[in-house]
Amino acid sequence: MSTRHDEFDDFLRVLDEAGCLSHVLIVGSWAEYLYEAAGAIAGYQCAIRTLDADVLVRNRRRPADALSMPEVAKRHGFLVVRDRITDTTKLVHPMGLEVEFLLGKVGAGLEPSMGTNLGVTAQTLRHLDILSHNPMGVRYQGMDVLVPIPEAYVAQKMVVNHERGAKSDKDAAAIANLWPHIDLDAFEVVRSSLTRRETARLDDYMRCHDSELAT
């Protein structure tokens, strides 16, 4: 897995060189890795089992002067791929790490993907505002990287777990692994910011997984 970590580090350097670090959050399993590697959560140990990295674009219209992340990625040896069906951009490291870009749906949210001022087209999904509204910075490999606060990370995974299909068990394991390290007051603040439907889904998850969340 150390090789995969090196590939992830290469991608972060692309973000840094392209001026994009402050405009994105690392989400998904690699956020868990950063919680541990950057020492953001004392005593926490993650388990990375994915070849993919998910990157949440905070605001598709920022910065005002558009950047070109794909051009920088190409210079670092990444393959830039455009999905013919979804029209989304994917970066592929020569050693296999795949990077996908996400964007929160707003309003009716009819578009499956949207362009961004970072030079990539991102897949649009609901409930990502739970993450984007709760960022925290970590210092890693000399770079300032944004991730969601762990409480928001866990809350969002609870809200969407029923939609995750085959990945729901893996996500439940990640939640259980993080839960002992969660600040319950901060978690309640995040919970109080959710919509009524999101709160119902979170509460339902907690009832169904009560034994896993016992502290």
What would you call each of these model-derived segments?
Residues 1-215:
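Compositionally biased terminal segments of proteins
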